[in-house]
C-alpha cells in the first residue's frame, strides 16, 4: 500500500508541470495575488484597490480620510471632487475642520444630489462662517476649449483632486476614485506627491476653479500655463487643447528589450488615442488594454490603417481607473514611465471637463507599482461578451 502511494505521488509530481502548461494562460494569471494596499518611497505614495481579491476593497477610498485625520490648526486642505456620497471621509474632513484646519471645497453640482454631499456642503459653511468654504460649479468650473455642444454626460467638474498642507508637508494628490460607494467595487488608484512647486501649481489651479475663471490676481492662464514641469514630473490641467496622454503616446517607440505599453482607462473614446495605441502595436510594442465596457473593447479591437491591437490583449473588467504604465523608449531613450489622473480618454475629458493628469518619467519603483496594479486587473478581466460596435463621434 505504501509503495503504491509513493508511486502515485511520484507520478502526480511529474505530471503537475505538464498539467500547468495545458492550463489556459488567463486562468494562471488570475491565480496571482491581487494588488491592494499603499506603498511610499521618496516623497511619493501610491494606493491601489483589487476588488476581485478583496471584497469591497476600501484602500483608495479610506486613504483621504486617514490623511484628513492628521490635520489640525494651521493646516489647509483643498478638495475638488466630482461625486461624494459616503460617510467616512465626510466625518473625517468635518472633524479636521473642527480641530482648526482650513478646509476648502470645489464640487460639481452632483454633490447636492445625496445626503452626504448636502451634509458636507452645509456643515463646512456652518463650522467656518467667516470664509467662503464651498464653491459648487454647474457644469465645468473653467471655460471650455471648444465651441460645443459638449458630448453627452460631459461638461462637468470631474476632479478627484486634493492639495494639502499638513504638518508642513505640501502635497499634490490625485485619484481615479470619486468618494462614492460604487467605487469600492471598482479598480482604482491614488497618487500623492510631496513637492512644494507642484503643490503651488495645484493651489493656483484650485483658486481658478473657485473663481470659475482663468484670471486670478490679474494673471490669466492660457493652455501653456496649465502645464507644470519639475524634474521628471509633469502635471497638466484641463480643459486644454493639448493632452498629456496623447503627447506621451506620440513620443513612445519600442525596442526588443523595452516594449511594454499597458493602459487601463475606464473609457476610451478618442480616435487619436486609439490610433497611437494601434501604431505602437504595429511597430512591435506589446500593447495591453483594460477598459470597463465591452463596447469600448470592440471599438479598440478594430483593425486600423495605423495598426491592429490583438483582440486577446484588449479586455474588460469593472474598473474606474485612468493609468498608463510604460517600459519603452520615450523621446528616444529607454525608460519607465507612468501617466495617471482623473481623465478618461474622451472629448469631454479633454475640452469640456475640469481634469488633472500627471506623468512621472524614470521612476522604476513607481512604474513597478502601477504595472502590478494593471497586471492584477488584466489577469481578472475577460473578453467582451457583446459584439455591439459603438459610434465614437470626433471631438469638436
Indicate where each model-derived feature is located.
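Hydrophobic alpha-helix feature that most strongly marks membrane-spanning transmembrane helices
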Residues: 282, 328, 343, 375, ...
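Short, glycine-rich nucleotide/cofactor-binding loops
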Residues: 79-85, 265-269
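Terminal interaction modules at protein C-ends
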Residues: 258-274, 286-299, 368-371, 375, ...
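Secretory targeting and sorting signals
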Residues: 1-29
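Short, well-ordered loop/turn and helix-capping segments at boundaries between secondary-structure elements
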Residues: 20, 24, 362, 366, ...
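HKD-type phospholipase D/PLD-like phosphodiesterase module
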Residues: 31-75, 83-254, 290-337, 341-363, ...
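Beta-propeller domains
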Residues: 230-285
